[in-house]
Each structure stands twice: as structure tokens, then as C-alpha cells.
């Protein structure tokens, strides 16, 4: 989406550090924040010099006070896990370049597909609810509104993963038959790898259309701050 156009990347909730490693090897200036160093230390220890362990609210304030700016700020499956996402988004504005990009990926919950599955009784409950892990839930429209209230405009939304389409088929409905879950996941990976092999550009466009329709088990929004 932005390869070779922007060169400083902050990954909030960087986990094992794979995104840092990927862009570092392409020559980007990278930095990551996470509560724990376990993941990055055990998977990409060479990225530890570009890593800070701690509360992202505290660390973002330090960066803003130091005048640090980034071309890209990435929150991959972390915004919906945060207790204070509005504060985090406000702090991100202070460290994001005026023409910078904020990338956010979250689980697509209360999606149009999930609502349809409930309506047609293909699932028996709101299976996506997670009392401990998700303080916030977003679908496409909810994510766009949430970011707009924080002062960001949406440039694009992408839907990722076809796995929940399996719930439409009684033979592959992994909510009712958990034994098929592994094979559904493997099929999803194979399909996406095949699509990318055929055309990365067309695969990206398919994901964009999925996101536009509010489909996909996960959604990724591309935002810029209003200036």
C-alpha cells in the first residue's frame, strides 16, 4: 500500500516483531512498542534495538514530547484490545506526519455477515463476543465513525480472510462442528496464497471490495489525520 513511498514506521503492539523485520530489511526506519518483550525476543531478537517495552500511552507521550514523527503508525489487532483507544488515537496524531498514514486492523465484529448468520439461524449466538479480550468491538462503519470522531478520515478499508464464509455451509460450519475448524483455516490459507500467487494487485483489490461491503473476518482501515 505504501512500500517505497514512506520511510518511518511505528508498530504499536508489535508482538513478535515480524512487521518490523520485514520493513527493516527493505531499508525503512522502524520502531515497535509492546507490553511484553517475550514475542520479539524469541522470534526476531535482532529487532530489539528498535523496540520499547511499556505502556503505549506513556511511550507515545514521550515520543510527542521529544518531537518524534512517523510516516506510518500501525495498530494491527491492538486497537480493539485497548482500554483507552481514544487517548491512543489522540496521541498518534501528535507523532504522525501531516501526510502520514494510520493503519488499523481489527476483528470485524457485528459484521453484515455475522448479522445475517444470526438472522438465518446458522449460528446460535454472538460467538465473537470475548469478555476478557475485547473491550471494544468494531465493524466497518463503526471503525470509520470512531476514527472520524478522533479526527481521522478514511482513505480505504480492506476486508481480510474468507474463513467465516464457511459458516454459511452446514458441512463447514465450525461454530457448530469444531472438528472442521482446522481444515477451514487451512483452506483459507491455501486460497489466499493462491490468489496472491496469481496477482498481488488483484488480490488487494478483492480485499478492498470485501472491505467496502463490510465483509471479511478482519478489517483494515487506512486513515489520514484531518489537518
Predicted regions and their residues:
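Conserved SAM-binding loop
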Residues: 1-120, 135-147, 218-225
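S-adenosyl-L-methionine-dependent methyltransferase catalytic module, highlighting the catalytic core
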Residues: 86-91, 101-224
Amino acid at each position: 500500500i505504501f512500500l517505497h513511498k514512506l520511510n518511518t514506521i511505528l508498530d504499536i503492539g508489535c508482538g513478535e516483531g515480524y512487521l518490523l523485520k520485514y520493513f527493516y530489511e527493505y531499508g525503512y526506519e522502524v520502531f515497535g512498542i509492546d507490553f511484553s518483550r517475550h514475542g520479539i525476543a524469541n522470534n526476531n531478537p535482532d529487532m530489539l534495538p528498535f523496540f520499547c517495552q511499556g505502556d503505549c500511552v506513556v511511550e507515545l507521550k514521550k515520543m510527542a514530547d521529544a518531537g518524534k514523527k512517523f510516516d506510518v503508525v500501525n495498530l494491527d489487532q491492538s486497537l480493539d484490545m485497548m482500554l483507552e483507544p481514544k487517548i491512543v488515537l489522540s496521541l498518534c496524531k501528535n507523532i504522525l506526519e501531516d501526510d502520514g498514514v494510520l493503519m488499523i486492523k481489527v476483528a470485524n465484529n457485528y459484521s453484515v455477515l455475522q448479522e445475517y448468520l444470526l438472522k438465518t439461524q446458522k449460528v446460535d449466538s454472538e460467538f465473537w463476543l470475548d469478555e476478557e479480550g475485547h473491550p471494544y468491538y468494531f465493524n466497518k462503519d463503526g471503525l470509520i465513525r470512531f476514527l472520524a470522531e478522533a479526527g481521522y478520515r478514511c482513505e480505504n478499508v480492506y476486508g481480510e480472510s474468507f474463513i467465516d464464509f464457511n459458516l454459511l455451509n452446514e458441512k463447514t460450519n465450525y461454530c457448530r462442528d469444531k472438528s472442521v475448524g482446522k481444515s477451514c483455516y487451512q483452506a483459507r490459507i491455501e486460497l489466499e496464497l493462491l490468489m496472491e500467487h496469481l496477482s498481488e494487485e488483484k488480490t488487494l483489490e478483492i480485499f478492498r471490495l470485501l472491505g467496502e461491503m463490510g465483509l471479511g473476518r478482519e478489517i483494515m482501515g487506512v486513515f489520514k489525520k484531518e489537518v
